[in-house]
Amino acid sequence: MNTSPLTVLSVPHDALNFAMPAEACDCHTHVFGPSANYPLSSERNYMPGDALVPDLLALHDGLQIARVVIVHPSPYGTDNACTLDALRLLGPRGRGVAVIDAHTTDAELQAMHKVGVRGIRLNLETSGIHNSDYAATQLRWATARVAPLGWHLQMFTNLSVMASLREVINTLDTPVVFDHFCLARAELGTSQPHFDTLLALLASGRVWLKLSAPHRVAQDPDGAAMTEMARTLIAHRPDRLLWGSDWPHPGGRPGQPRHRDQVEAFNPINDGHALNRLAAWVDDAATLRQILATNPARLYDF
């Protein structure tokens, strides 16, 4: 158990108050920069600062996290160079989730696979896309592209769109992963519209859910509402749950406008505290090991 103080990118992180399972994995992180090396997309909706592989390794080594998944961030569009170079630096401890489009070739997908990519992300929420027909079309297209590689589809979307895709998902052999609690709002409780569909899809074994970035879905990530929602999910299907920090925590600040041409500060999230909160939600060493180590090993082919 680590008791040393840890500060990364000027953000302090609490020491762990539980025994971290061996081969634990942070299933949702991003790497940005160096900014001089990787051009941003002209269609980005924010400008990130640098958050480099050495910073990520300092965080994970300090928190005893042995494995990591780099999710390609939206400001780079479909230019995956920054993420792929990060995977090359990480070696066998890293896996990746890319963002592609119709111009991405099969040869490029094969090359991504060799450096550790195991899925692609559909960033619907980032682009403000809530059209169910469009989402279904994208899901079918993406499945056709990645199924031959054995990859999964990761979707950033909300409960309503997720529910509209239920029939499509039930026809797929490709695993579907929803990140950030599928944007279920903690304060609306477990009876909120479409939460029952999320539970049903988890029960079917066709989808996975990331218990990531609770600050995105709760006014108080430590509060009773967030705890109730998380524990409901954990009790329901722990073998389909993953944990991710969302480091370095992009996403803007509530009430503050976003600027494409001005560096946006990352949210100062305490990831040690987030892990301790997860351990308190679970309160069972075997289930915690399943969420932090066993499940990621299966999904990401570690």
Residue ranges and their predicted role:
Residues 28, 60, 83, 112, ...:
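Conserved, mostly hydrophobic/aromatic
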Residues 24-29, 68-71, 94-98, 120-122, ...:
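Hydrophobic faces of well-ordered beta-strands that scaffold small-molecule active sites
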Residues 1-78, 261:
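An N-terminally biased module of ancient metal coordination in phosphate/nucleic-acid-related enzymes
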Residues 39-50, 67-71, 113, 118-134, ...:
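Glycine-rich phosphate-binding "P-loop"
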Residues 4-11, 192-302:
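H/E-rich (His + Asp/Glu) clusters that bind or coordinate divalent metals
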Residues 25, 29-31, 138, 142, ...:
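A generic "structured core" feature
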Residues 3-12, 77-160, 167-169, 208-219, ...:
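Active-site gating/metal-coordination segments in enzymes
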Residues 52-56, 104-107, 162-163, 190-198:
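Alpha-helical scaffolding within the catalytic cores
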